[in-house]
């Protein structure tokens, strides 16, 4: 049919048919974030999940603004306040350390860059909801309202394990997470938008010599693996190497330094 032909034509032209992440390698791999997909972005703490998610949300909002579409990006931040998240986005886009922003340790050039970036972000169609421990029902209702009033291109959730379900606590956390991921997938289909949901990984990762994440590391979190259309992992080897610095001047230190570089 015509819609299928148009879709295939886009693929042949190597165009991004989904919501662009703004990250070239990722967009080439996925073709953007596709409607109705539940995309899981998982990793251990301090791996950069939120940093990656905020970059994707910012780039997607820029894309909407550039195309002058009646649409928006909804970011549900369960861990950070809207002020903290906004500061982080500002820091990343203005290329200024967030600690320096908080302490006022910025140069005049950085201040000018900060002001310009602030103006750009102010105009972005990016909604941040900072409700802690939000339920899947409440999140879904708010997403529906945003789509009805402003249009909606992408939902970001940071992160799954901080959400609550409507189940009795006696049902267990695994069942609760299962209801949440099933609800997020259902919402993606209902609103025909991609849902990018962040997830923590099992502590078992820390017990292995090879700490690169695997799908099995999601299994303690119920049906995440089964409900997701795409699973992506964030992994920084340098995070672990920094904690294993050998004695300065040793052969091991030279090898360690080579890996760090």
Regions found by a protein language model. Name each.
Residues 74, 152-197:
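Helical hairpin unit composed of two closely spaced alpha helices linked by a short loop
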Residues 27, 175-261:
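Phosphate-binding/switch region of NTP-binding enzymes
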Residues 10-27:
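N-terminal pre-Walker A segment at the start of P-loop NTPase domains
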Residues 45:
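The conserved Walker
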Residues 2-12:
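Single conserved hydrophobic/aromatic residue that forms the stacking wall/gate
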Residues 49:
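Conserved lysine of the Walker
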Residues 19, 29-36, 66-67:
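Phosphate-binding P-loop
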Residues 28, 59-151, 165:
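Cytosolic-facing regulatory segments adjacent to core modules
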């Amino acid at each position: 049919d015509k819609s299928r032909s148009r879709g295939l034509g886009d693929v042949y032209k190597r165009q991004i048919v989904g919501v662009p992440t703004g990250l070239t390698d990722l967009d080439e791999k996925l073709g953007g974030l596709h409607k109705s997909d539940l995309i899981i972005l998982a990793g251990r703490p301090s791996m950069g999940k939120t940093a990656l998610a905020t970059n994707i949300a910012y780039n997607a909002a820029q894309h909407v603004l550039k195309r002058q579409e009646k649409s928006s990006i909804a970011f549900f931040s369960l861990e950070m306040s809207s002020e903290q998240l906004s500061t982080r986005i500002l820091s990343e886009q203005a290329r200024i350390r967030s600690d320096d922003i908080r302490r006022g340790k910025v140069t005049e050039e950085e201040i000018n860059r900060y002001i310009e970036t602030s103006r750009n972000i102010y105009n972005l169609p990016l909604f941040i909801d900072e409700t802690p421990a939000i339920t899947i029902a409440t999140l879904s209702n708010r997403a529906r309202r945003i789509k009805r009033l402003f249009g909606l291109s992408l939902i970001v959730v940071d992160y799954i394990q901080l959400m609550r379900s409507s189940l009795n606590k006696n049902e267990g956390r695994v069942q609760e997470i299962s209801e949440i991921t099933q609800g997020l997938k259902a919402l993606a289909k209902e609103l025909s938008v991609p849902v990018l949901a962040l997830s923590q990984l099992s502590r078992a990762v820390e017990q292995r010599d090879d700490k690169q994440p695997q799908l099995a590391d999601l299994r303690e979190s119920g049906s995440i693996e089964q409900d997701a259309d795409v699973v992506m992992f964030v992994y920084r080897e340098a995070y672990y190497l920094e904690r294993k610095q050998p004695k300065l001047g040793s052969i091991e230190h030279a090898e360690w330094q080579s890996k760090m570089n």
